[in-house]
């Protein structure tokens, strides 16, 4: 076993990386409220795992979506648990993200030199809200249908470009298969990819600049 470790150590300097991680200075004012960002990340990872599991059974069509969700909840092994954990962690992710934003704002974590960290965090907040909107429509039940109809209809009030924006969001003049396909693609591919990209920008900046000082 030591030979295997030595082989990797010689090429990757694993011990130096481990020492850097474990020896990072943590300011004495840090408390549990500074863990909210990490909890949000944990919720996101749970979302990825449970969401991936549900893609094996979910069918993104207007005729089969609701029935496939019913199948997940009643027939698939532990499907009810996986979907419930997905929903609970989604709510927890939104709550933790909001509390994290408040903590950062109240402790001045957005000030120089951490402006870019704040900007990437705001983008992650928008992506989190987008997860909620797109995911809400996927069961294709009455609540999801009307929620999507209202949300996608909001831009209609914008002069000139309102109607084209609505059609772009829905994929047609009304909420239908094109809308479900768009939202499913956004929810399962585009948004997770963008979230991962901005997280890979967000965390190294925190690592480099350290935790902001007390007020």
From Swiss-Prot:
GO terms for cellular component: chloroplast thylakoid membrane. InterPro entries: Cyt_b/b6_N, Cyt_B6_PetB, Cytb/b6-like_sf, Cytochrome_b_N_euk/bac, Di-haem_cyt_TM. Heme b 2 binds at residues 86, 187. It is a multi-pass membrane protein. Its cofactor is heme b; heme c. One of its GO terms (molecular function) is electron transporter, transferring electrons within cytochrome b6/f complex of photosystem II activity. Keywords: Chloroplast, Electron transport, Heme, Iron, Membrane, Metal-binding, Photosynthesis, Plastid, Thylakoid, Transmembrane, Transmembrane helix, Transport. It is found in: Plastid, Chloroplast thylakoid membrane. Pfam families: Cytochrome_B. SUPFAM superfamilies: Transmembrane di-heme cytochromes. Binds 2 heme b groups non-covalently with two histidine residues as axial ligands. Binds one heme group covalently by a single cysteine link with no axial amino acid ligand. This heme was named heme ci. The chain crosses the membrane at residues 32-52, 90-110, 116-136, 186-206. Component of the cytochrome b6-f complex, which mediates electron transfer between photosystem II (PSII) and photosystem I (PSI), cyclic electron flow around PSI, and state transitions. Belongs to the cytochrome b family. PetB subfamily. The 4 large subunits of the cytochrome b6-f complex are cytochrome b6, subunit IV (17 kDa polypeptide, PetD), cytochrome f and the Rieske protein, while the 4 small subunits are PetG, PetL, PetM and PetN. The complex functions as a dimer. Heme 1 (or BH or b566) is high-potential and absorbs at about 566 nm, and heme 2 (or BL or b562) is low-potential and absorbs at about 562 nm. This is Cytochrome b6. It comes from Jasminum nudiflorum (Winter jasmine). The lineage of its organism: Eukaryota, Viridiplantae, Streptophyta, Embryophyta, Tracheophyta. The gene is petB.
